[in-house]
């Protein structure tokens, strides 16, 4: 097993999703694009691909960039639906960061003539 496969396959969100203190008291928006998300369809086992758009206004914590990359990559061998993967990412980040505002958009590549976009926005909940 290559080192990249090993670190992704052994990623534990509870201990490996590194969170840093936010050193700035002003409000600001962090935007990330994660274009290489993949997981497996829970029904067929076929791969699903998406771009994950994350934006948040931090409170006291921010997520370390390599850690969010590894977390997103840890989905690649999991059988999980579009809805469940987007909601899991949102729930984990909301719990760990406790941001003032957060929005996740999971924009899945079309498969079988269906294009799915899942959006979870704390300002609309």
Swiss-Prot record:
Keyword Lipid biosynthesis applies: no
Keyword Cytoplasm applies: yes
Molecular function in Gene Ontology: preQ1 synthase activity
GO biological processes: queuosine biosynthetic process; tRNA modification
Residues annotated as the enzyme's active site: 41 (thioimide intermediate), 48 (proton donor)
Catalytic activity line of the entry: 7-aminomethyl-7-carbaguanine + 2 NADP(+) = 7-cyano-7-deazaguanine + 2 NADPH + 3 H(+)
EC number(s) on file: 1.7.1.13
Cell location: Cytoplasm
UniProt record similarity statement: Belongs to the GTP cyclohydrolase I family. QueF type 1 subfamily.
Physiological role: Catalyzes the NADPH-dependent reduction of 7-cyano-7-deazaguanine (preQ0) to 7-aminomethyl-7-deazaguanine (preQ1).
NCBIfam families: QueF-II (TIGR03139)
Record protein name field: NADPH-dependent 7-cyano-7-deazaguanine reductase
Organism: Sulfurimonas denitrificans (strain ATCC 33889 / DSM 1251) (Thiomicrospira denitrificans (strain ATCC 33889 / DSM 1251))
């Amino acid at each position: 097993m290559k080192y990249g496969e090993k670190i992704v396959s052994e990623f534990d969100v509870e201990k490996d999703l590194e969170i840093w203190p936010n050193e700035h008291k002003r409000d600001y928006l962090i935007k990330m694009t994660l274009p290489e998300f993949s997981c497996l369809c829970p029904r067929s086992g076929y791969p699903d691909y998406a771009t994950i758009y994350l934006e948040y206004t931090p409170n006291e914590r921010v997520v370390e960039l390599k850690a969010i990359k590894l977390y997103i990559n840890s989905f690649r061998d999991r059988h999980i639906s579009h809805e469940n993967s987007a909601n899991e990412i949102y729930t984990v980040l909301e719990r760990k960061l406790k941001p003032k505002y957060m929005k996740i958009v999971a924009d899945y590549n079309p498969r079988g003539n269906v294009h799915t976009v899942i959006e979870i926005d704390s300002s609309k909940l």
